[in-house]
Each structure stands twice: as structure tokens, then as C-alpha cells.
């Protein structure tokens, strides 16, 4: 374990992060298990980095992990773990859309309006340990993927999803991703085009997110609005 009481160690770690921004103009950092480092360290790091460039800081954590809001609000974006687990439960028919509505409302309440949640159906942990999206979502793969574009926040496409990969990639091993399944490439391309072309799907504090119909557990009717632009998810 690192001793974060050692200020010299903290400064050397921040120096290393500054190096890649100054010398290689990288756009930001993903902080793996961000809650394993004290919020004070991240505040110091992010303050110094943003004096160089407005880097994007992504925390692999959420407000329900250690550090809570104090930690997460230091970052521009964090993982929507609670939303992801909700999608998994719905796919397994353990939960329903009422539970998803509850999760959306909790997130709106628990995160400040300027924070970005990263929505996902897969990532390196889930793919390796819990299974591919086809293992977990079955025939609903595309529906749940589209939902990550519609929920408040930013969608994540994990390695291989754009080619419909059914491989559980191993940590620290070389795995090749076959770039053959154009169906999923075109699917994600279309989702991204829809997101780019519709202002209601952009990230903004002024986005209005509305649940229009909660009369059934199995059909959802959602609406996003911004600057006169409306988009619906059914």
C-alpha cells in the first residue's frame, strides 16, 4: 500500500501525471479504483493538472463507494455502477423498469448537475468476470446499448462491442479482437450519429429528462428535451 501521508510521494505521482499532459498533450486520465486514494490527493492532483490543460478526469468509482460525493465531485465523470447493475438485474428479470426509474431519480438527486455519469453495458471488469454482453443481456443487447445513449450522461463502448465480440478478454493477456461483424459497427455508428445530431442527447445542465409512462413494468416511455429538441425512448 502507498503511504499518502508522504507528501514527497504525492508530489512525485503528480509530477508523473503532469509529464504526460505537458510532453504528450494527453486529454485526461481514468483513475482506476479512485476511491482507493484519499480525496485530498485527488484534489491536489486535479488542481495542478487543470492549470496546464482542461483535462478530462474520469473516476472508476461512484458516490456509493468510499469517499462519496466529496471524492466524486472532484472528477468530471464517474462510472454509473448503480445504473449498470440495475440494467443487469432487469435483463435477468430480477428487477423491472420501476426500479430503473428509481435509480435515475436517485442519481439526479445524489450527483451535482455538472457531473457526468458514464453509462455502460460492459467494461474490462464486467467482461472478464461477469461475462460478455451476450451472456448477460441475450437478445436485449442492442436495446440496453441504446439505453446507455439515452440515460443522462455519456455512453461507453468497451473494446470489441463495436464488432459484436463474444470473447471474455483476459487481464494482462494479449487478446485479438476480430473486426468482422459490421452489423454492430454500423449499429454503434448510428447510435453515435443520433446522439451527435440531437441536442437533447448532448451533455448539458439544462437537459430535461422525463419519465412519461410508468403504467407498466415492461414498457418504458422516456423523453429528453433541450433547446426545443425532443427525443423519445420506447
Predicted features and spans:
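Conserved, mostly hydrophobic/aromatic
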Residues: 13, 20, 31, 57, ...
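Carbohydrate-binding surface patches
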Residues: 211-234
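Active-site-proximal helices and loops of the catalytic beta/alpha 8
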Residues: 22, 32-117, 147, 164-190, ...
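Substrate-binding cleft of secreted/luminal carbohydrate-active enzymes
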Residues: 145-166
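The substrate-binding groove and active-site-proximal loops of carbohydrate-active enzymes
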Residues: 1-10, 27-36, 84-94, 126-137, ...
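Short, acidic/polar
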Residues: 5-23, 139-145
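Amphipathic alpha-helical
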Residues: 184-205
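Loop/turn elements at helix/coil->beta-strand transitions in domains of secreted/extracellular proteins
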Residues: 26-27, 52-55, 153-154
Amino acid at each position: 500500500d502507498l503511504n499518502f501521508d508522504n507528501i514527497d510521494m504525492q508530489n512525485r505521482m503528480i509530477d508523473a501525471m503532469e509529464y504526460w499532459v505537458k510532453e504528450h498533450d494527453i486529454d485526461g486520465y481514468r483513475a482506476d479504483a479512485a476511491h482507493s486514494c484519499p480525496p485530498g490527493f485527488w484534489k491536489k492532483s486535479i488542481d495542478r493538472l487543470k492549470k496546464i490543460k482542461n483535462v478530462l478526469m474520469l473516476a472508476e468509482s461512484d458516490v456509493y463507494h468510499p469517499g462519496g460525493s466529496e471524492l466524486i465531485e472532484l472528477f468530471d465523470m464517474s462510472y454509473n455502477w448503480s445504473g449498470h447493475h440495475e440494467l443487469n438485474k432487469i435483463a435477468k428479470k430480477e428487477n423491472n423498469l420501476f426500479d430503473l426509474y428509481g435509480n435515475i431519480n436517485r442519481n439526479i438527486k445524489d450527483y451535482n448537475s455538472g457531473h457526468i455519469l458514464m453509462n455502460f453495458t460492459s467494461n474490462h471488469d464486467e467482461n472478464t468476470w461477469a461475462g460478455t454482453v451476450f451472456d448477460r443481456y441475450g437478445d436485449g443487447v442492442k436495446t440496453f446499448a441504446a439505453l446507455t445513449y439515452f440515460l443522462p450522461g455519456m455512453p461507453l463502448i468497451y473494446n470489441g462491442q463495436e464488432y459484436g465480440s463474444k470473447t471474455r478478454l483476459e487481464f494482462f493477456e494479449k487478446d485479438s479482437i476480430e473486426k468482422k461483424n459490421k452489423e454492430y459497427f454500423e449499429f454503434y455508428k448510428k447510435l453515435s450519429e443520433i446522439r451527435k445530431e440531437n441536442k437533447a442527447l448532448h451533455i448539458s445542465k439544462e437537459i430535461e429528462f422525463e419519465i412519461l409512462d410508468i403504467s407498466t413494468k415492461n414498457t418504458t416511455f422516456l423523453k429528453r428535451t433541450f433547446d426545443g429538441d425532443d427525443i423519445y425512448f420506447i
